[in-house]
């Protein structure tokens, strides 16, 4: 026992009571209910921070408090002391740590509850006191005003207005509502003086006051009310900012009164929004002028959306314009322009062809142009040594060296002369690319070298080549080949050229004729000099610094390389990696290969190259243009593909030759191009001479080519390029030509009698002439009465005086023998029934289309317009 007491004495001193070391909360929290207008309130959490100090008393640490501020705090202190005493007593009984923590928590909950109850009680007391004070102040103010008014009324009947004014003046000073005790001593002072006066008034004259309540007294009473309203206490100036933000403190919560700013109610917010909406509606919305983009065809709904109007309004506008359309119906750009103008917007017309705008670039100035090599096409009969001449010219290329047997990789190549000048040659067997390029109006070839054998002279295919060159509008240089043969007669060739309007320099013309021998390599230098001289006369120049443009000479699909196009660059410089468009195809340049099979990085003007990287295979003769990015290339290629599909669809729908020449009827063309193929030369000459005599100053037949033999692919290509007619006299087309004609839409006519040819051609030429319009008189009608019909307009009641009046005919309105209107007859009725015509002596009702200025006594002249076909 003594040992245990010794151990208790030796126990070290602790800063807290025995048990687990804990920290009590130094921040007490509570909740305060904050009130708003319309009976709304919300609970706000507040915090109170305390500074706690402890001292040692009786071997344990106790908290030192500043003092008990209220009875509740004293009770709490006593309760805390009891709990601490109980805890010390319980420590002797070995309480567990969990029990100690539970008791401590229960104590804290009790303290917090007491604090909340006290805070709510104080808040309620303060609020009730403020309400009672405000009510008492309002009652005192009302009583004071009533006494002053009574005193003023009593003083008015007396002849002392001077005394009444000082009595009312003490009311003028305003006092704050918060100063409630101030009016108490002032209340008996104000009416102290008027009381004897009010009592003396009935003593002197009892009926004076009732008689005094006249109109003047009522007016004075109104003025007193206005003065009282003017002297109302001024509102308390708000010292706090509106829409207070931040944390609510205990002081603000306990001292809350009516002066504090309250939040806006939901009803006030709704009223403000309604006022703004009404103000916006009353002000009226200003019309917004928009820029409406209108394509070639647009639906009514889409047009309404772009103008930001209702579709029904657009339909009404179309009805006023005489167009009946539904919401989903397409209208043309002209009608859409009228609608947009009617609504007051600005219109911008666009077309699908706008994607091609700016594709060719701007025109080059003379400062940026440099001389470029000429592009030469070698043409002629296959047996006249054209291939041998090409091989001989290629062998003179100083770049290729002495080997000479260089394989030609592409259909075009470039030769460098000994002088350093370059010439680009294009090999066009069959002339497919040449005619296709002419059809697109592309002037690819600068000079044509016409090869004619000195021993054979002019052959049918030579004549065909001459016509191709003339159609392209390029100068011709005649190369008279095979002069080394014994039977060569160059002079005969020059004489035969005169029949085809080619006059050589030896005969006084301007056509250069060079006598050469491809086999013996004679006068090749003279031919090259003649080409360079002609190029110098043409002054061929190009800008090498701009975006590349050119033409596709030929295109093919190769295994392992994909689509490969042979391109002749005309302007600019083509580089690897550039994006380009070739006809309806596009791609990116993956590689450039020259005519010697070498890969190059770029190609300048008049340079033929192979281009790899196409997405598809273009057609020979398509234009080749580089663009800025792939998006533009896809857009252009897509547009051209659609145009090609539409053109093919139109060709498939075309059934007669008259439909093919519908454009000619509208005045777009005045010539009928024809290609003639026959069995014998005599028949061809007869047909040609007959067709050339046809026509007049307005229309005529243009013979593109006339030869003996079957119809082949070259004839189809020539007819397609010129959009002409192909005539076969006692001959037929081979299978390849038929397939090509079916694909390209070329019309082939077969004949066996020459008179049938002349009759059909005469009808075609007559169809090209515009028909003659002739007026046919129908009758007269006199207007006897004018009726105004609802939803119809003015209707003329007429009597037919001469001839017949037909529905749908043309009419003239005559007034005093002067024509004042010419238009169409809209309606023709007899006894409310629509009739086709009305004869002389009958009455009828007539209305005019889009015209209502009709009067009694006017005369209506009815007539028809007849189209008379013009014949040759």
Curated annotation (Swiss-Prot):
Assigned protein family: Belongs to the TRAFAC class translation factor GTPase superfamily. Classic translation factor GTPase family. IF-2 subfamily.
Residue stretches making up the tr-type G domain: 371-539
Region feature Disordered, mapped onto this chain: 130-282
InterPro entries linked to this entry: EF-G-like_DII (IPR053905), EFTu-like_2 (IPR004161), IF2_assoc_dom_bac (IPR013575), IF2_II (IPR044145), IF2_N (IPR006847), P-loop_NTPase (IPR027417), Small_GTP-bd (IPR005225), T_Tr_GTP-bd_dom (IPR000795)
Region annotation (G3) ranges: 427-430
Region spans: G2: 405-409
Compositional bias (Pro residues): 182-194
GO cellular component, as recorded: cytosol
Region (G5): 517-519
Pfam families attached to this UniProt entry: EF-G_D2, GTP_EFTU, GTP_EFTU_D2, IF-2, IF2_assoc, IF2_N
Region (G4): 481-484
Residues given in the record as GTP binding sites: 380-387, 427-431, 481-484
Main location as per UniProt: cytoplasm
Role played: One of the essential components for the initiation of protein synthesis. Protects formylmethionyl-tRNA from spontaneous hydrolysis and promotes its binding to the 30S ribosomal subunits. Also involved in the hydrolysis of GTP during the formation of the 70S ribosomal complex.
Annotated spans, G1: 380-387
Full protein name: Translation initiation factor IF-2
Keywords recorded for this protein, A-Z: Cytoplasm, GTP-binding, Initiation factor, Nucleotide-binding, Protein biosynthesis
Composition-biased stretches (Basic and acidic residues): 130-155, 271-282
Source organism (scientific name): Paramagnetospirillum magneticum (strain ATCC 700264 / AMB-1)
Single GO term (MF): GTP binding
Location(s) in or outside the cell: Cytoplasm
Biased composition range(s): Low complexity: 156-181, 195-211
């Amino acid at each position: 026992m003594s040992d245990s007491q010794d151990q208790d004495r030796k126990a070290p001193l602790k800063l807290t009571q025995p048990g687990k070391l804990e920290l009590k909360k130094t921040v007490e929290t509570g909740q305060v209910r904050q009130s708003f207008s319309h009976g709304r309130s919300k609970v706000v959490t507040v915090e109170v921070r305390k500074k706690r100090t402890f001292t040692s008393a009786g071997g344990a640490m106790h908290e030192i408090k500043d003092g008990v501020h209220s009875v509740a705090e004293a009770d709490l202190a006593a309760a805390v002391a009891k709990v601490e005493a109980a805890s010390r007593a319980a420590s002797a009984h070995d309480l567990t740590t969990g029990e100690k923590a539970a008791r401590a928590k229960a104590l804290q909950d009790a303290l917090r509850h007491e604090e909340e109850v006290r805070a709510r009680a104080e808040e309620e007391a303060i609020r009730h006191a403020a309400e009672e004070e405000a009510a008492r102040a309002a009652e005192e103010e009302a009583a004071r005003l009533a006494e002053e008014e009574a005193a003023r009324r009593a003083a008015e009947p007396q002849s002392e207005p001077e005394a009444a004014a000082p009595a009312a003046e003490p009311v003028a000073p305003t006092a704050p509502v918060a100063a409630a005790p101030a009016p108490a001593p002032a209340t008996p002072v104000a009416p102290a003086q008027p009381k004897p006066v009010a009592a003396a008034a009935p003593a002197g004259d009892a009926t004076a006051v009732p008689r005094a309540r006249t109109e003047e007294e009522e007016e004075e009473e109104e003025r007193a009310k206005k003065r009282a309203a003017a002297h109302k206490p001024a509102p308390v100036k708000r010292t706090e900012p509106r829409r207070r933000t931040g944390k609510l403190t205990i002081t603000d919560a306990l001292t809350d009164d009516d002066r504090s700013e309250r939040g806006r109610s939901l009803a006030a917010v709704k009223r403000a929004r309604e006022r703004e909406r009404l103000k916006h509606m009353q002000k009226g919305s200003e019309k917004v002028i928009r820029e409406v983009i209108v394509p070639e065809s647009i639906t009514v709904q889409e047009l309404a959306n772009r103008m930001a109007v209702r579709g029904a309004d657009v339909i009404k506008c179309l009805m006023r314009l005489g167009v009946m359309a539904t919401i989903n119906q397409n209208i043309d750009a002209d009608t859409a322009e009228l609608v947009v103008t009617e609504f007051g917007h600005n219109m911008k017309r666009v077309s699908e062809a706008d994607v091609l705008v700016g594709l060719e670039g701007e025109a080059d100035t003379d400062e940026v142009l440099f001389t470029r090599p000429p592009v030469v096409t070698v043409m002629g009969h296959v047996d006249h040594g054209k291939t041998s001449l090409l091989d001989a010219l290629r062998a003179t290329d100083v770049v290729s060296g002495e080997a000479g047997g260089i394989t030609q990789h592409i259909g075009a190549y470039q030769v460098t002369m000994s002088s350093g000048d370059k010439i680009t040659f294009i090999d066009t067997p069959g002339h497919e690319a040449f005619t296709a390029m002419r059809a697109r109006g592309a002037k690819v070839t600068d000079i044509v070298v016409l090869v004619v054998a000195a021993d054979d002279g002019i052959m049918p295919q030579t004549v065909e080549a001459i016509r191709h060159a003339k159609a392209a509008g390029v100068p011709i240089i005649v190369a008279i080949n095979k002069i080394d043969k014994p039977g060569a007669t160059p002079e005969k060739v020059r004489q035969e050229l005169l029949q085809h309007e080619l006059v050589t320099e030896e005969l006084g013309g301007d056509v250069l004729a060079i006598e050469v021998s491809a086999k013996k390599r004679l006068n090749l230098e003279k031919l090259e000099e003649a080409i360079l001289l002609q190029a110098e006369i043409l002054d061929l120049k190009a800008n090498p610094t701009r975006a590349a443009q050119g033409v596709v000479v030929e295109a093919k699909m190769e295994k392992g390389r994909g689509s490969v196009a042979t391109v002749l660059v005309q302007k600019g410089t083509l580089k690897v990696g550039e994006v380009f468009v070739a006809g309806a195809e596009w791609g990116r340049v993956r590689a450039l290969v020259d005519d010697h099979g070498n890969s190059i990085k770029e190609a300048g003007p008049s340079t033929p190259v192979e281009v790899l990287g196409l997405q598809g295979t273009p057609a020979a003769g398509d234009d080749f243009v580089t663009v800025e990015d792939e998006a533009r290339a896809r857009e252009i290629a897509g547009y051209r593909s659609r145009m090609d599909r539409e053109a093919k669809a139109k060709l498939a729908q075309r059934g007669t030759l008259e439909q093919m020449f519908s454009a000619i009827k509208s005045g777009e063309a005045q010539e009928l191009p024809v290609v003639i193929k026959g069995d014998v030369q005599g028949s061809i000459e007869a047909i040609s001479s007959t067709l050339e005599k046809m026509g007049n100053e307005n229309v005529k037949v243009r013979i593109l080519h006339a030869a003996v033999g079957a119809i082949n692919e070259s004839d189809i290509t020539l007819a397609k390029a010129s959009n002409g007619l192909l005539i076969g006299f006692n001959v037929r087309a081979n299978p390849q030509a038929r397939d090509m004609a079916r694909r390209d839409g070329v019309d082939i006519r077969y004949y066996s009698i020459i008179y049938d040819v002349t009759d059909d051609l005469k009808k075609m030429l007559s169809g090209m002439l515009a028909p003659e319009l002739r007026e046919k008189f129908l009758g007269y009608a006199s207007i006897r009465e004018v009726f105004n019909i609802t939803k119809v307009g003015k209707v003329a009641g007429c009597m037919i005086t001469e001839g017949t009046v037909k529905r749908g005919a043309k009419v003239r309105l005559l007034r005093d023998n002067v024509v004042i209107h010419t238009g169409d007859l809209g309606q023709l009725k007899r006894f409310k029934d629509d009739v086709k015509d009305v004869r002389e002596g009958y009455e009828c009702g007539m209305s005019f289309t889009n015209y209502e200025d009709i009067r009694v006594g006017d005369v209506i002249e009815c007539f028809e317009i007849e189209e008379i076909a013009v014949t040759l």
